[in-house]
Amino acid sequence: MIKFCSILEDSPTKIAFHPKPKGIIQFIGAFVFGSCPERSYEHLFKYLYKKDYSLIVYPLTFEPFNFNHWSVATELLIDLYRVRFEIIRKLKNEAPDKLDFYANDTNYFWLGHSLGCKYILLLEILSHDNSELRDEVLRSCLRGKSLQKVNKDIRMADNNREVVVDEISKFIRDQPSLLLAPEISNTVQIFNIPIRPSSRLGFPNRHETKCLIEHSTELFNLIGLISFNLDGIARDDVDFLECQLRTRKFRHFLHKVFLGWHFEPQGIYIENLGPVLKPSGIDRYAEVSAF
């Protein structure tokens, strides 16, 4: 039976510790639905837990008209550092036999759905260990006050990372990610109709996000995509990401297309979608179950 708990009183992040985990999945969900992930992705989480994965779920604050994705990503990154540090501290005191497993970065990977995929991409950029290269990418794609605001947010996140650097390592980069119906273009679903108000809505907007991905040539080397043939929301973004990711230095590049629509990962037949993950690296994505 899956049971989520809070590891920090002032953090919305929920964790389900599996008694015998073979991996640790970190999850960020879709626009609106990502603010109540335990209910919206109930079937997905039960499936993954049954497959022997511990889960770390990062809920999004319910702010339907907040398109400042940089600020949200920065808050997620700071919370991520704090949660990871607390997991290590807690296990040291209460379950030292499990400490090595949860302290090993190779046991962690990311799973995102829809807008949650954009946050995972931003998190990898924000946590880049080469600050000079990261800043060069930001200067190439952002201007004026936007760049100033991002630099301020990054300094705040970097300060939090320095506090816990002895306990954790670079755990965004080099952790495999699987993106389900990735959506980076600020599309909103109203009465089952996908609406993309403006290519310049949001921060970073569609143009800026694409620029950041295109210029981050050292990143995104461990990413797989799953898309759906009836998805009218993420189709353009999937095409863009597939084109970009094929240029990265993959050992295996995965893009699987399934029957279904954009919100298929929230359905009750999630076992038809669930990835069969292998024990190490991007090889985890070499097999995916078919419908």
Language-model features: where?
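Short, surface-exposed "cap/lid" segments of acyl-processing enzymes
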Residues: S6-E63
